[in-house]
Structure formats: structure tokens, C-alpha cells
Amino acid sequence: MSSPDFNTLPLTDLGNAERLAARFGHRLRHCHLWNRWLQYDGARWATDDTGEIHRLAATTARLLLDEARDLAQLAQAAEELERQRLIDVVEATVKWAKRSEGVARINAMVELARSRPGIPVRPEEMDSDPWLFNAVNGTIDLRTGDLQPHDPQDLITKLAPVQYDPEARY
């Protein structure tokens, strides 16, 4: 999902899932067959064994208050009729933000985010390029021997605990 105007997203569980995907989707994937969340750690896609997805969902819920603040600033500069409409939206957003911090809303956000565009991944997509070898300091293209920066688009889950040194000799 491209960066939306968060104030246009609905104040619903699905709207919250869209917010989560828009804010953090670049570092989140979900594999339905594995029933696992994966998070990109800067070098590889690792299984979320610590509940990071729920922390990101909680952050998303808290950021609803920033959306309300932004709307309140717009309301101050608006004409009277538009100002009242924006004030009503601010009040609804603050109320929704408080409700969104509950466990049911957090779990709903996480559940619905699993299928948002860009989030689902199939097992066969992971580690699918046999010519990429992931080292601590980058990914080696085994066809060329070139070291390239880690890239989440490579969908690599493995990380060899070694530094690649192109000058090394055996």
C-alpha cells in the first residue's frame, strides 16, 4: 500500500490494518501456510518470535492520536462549517484511538493485516534465488561474486555468520 492520507482511512479494524500495513509493511510479511509473521531485521526475514507485530500494532493505535492532532490543526484554519465537521472527526478519532489500544482491536488489526496488499508471502517465494548467499555484511551474487547490500526484496531468511571478504584467499 502506498502512503495514504491516514486521515482518509476509516476508523475501523480494517482501517487500522491498512494503517499498520502502510506504516510498517516494508518490514513485515505473513506466511499463511506457516501461520507465521516475519520481520525484516536489516539483513534477512526472521520469524517474529517476540511479538513485534503486536508492538507495531500498538504503535499504530497510538499514532491515531497524531492523526487527531493533525486534523485539529486543520480545523483551526478551516471555515466555520468545515471546522465543525473536522472537530467531530477529531473527537471520533480520539475515541477510536482509545478503543484501538484494547487487546481485541490490536488482535483484529494484526489478523486483518495478514492479507493486506504486500504483506502475504508464500513459502516458495522465500529463499528462492539459489545464486544469492547472505553474509553478515551483504548478499553475495554467486554468479558474479559481487557483494550487494541486503535487500528485503530478495526474500532471504538465512544468514551465514561470516563477513564476506573479496580479497580473501584460501
Regions inferred by a protein language model and the residue ranges of each:
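Intein modules and their embedded homing endonuclease domains
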Residues: M1-Y170
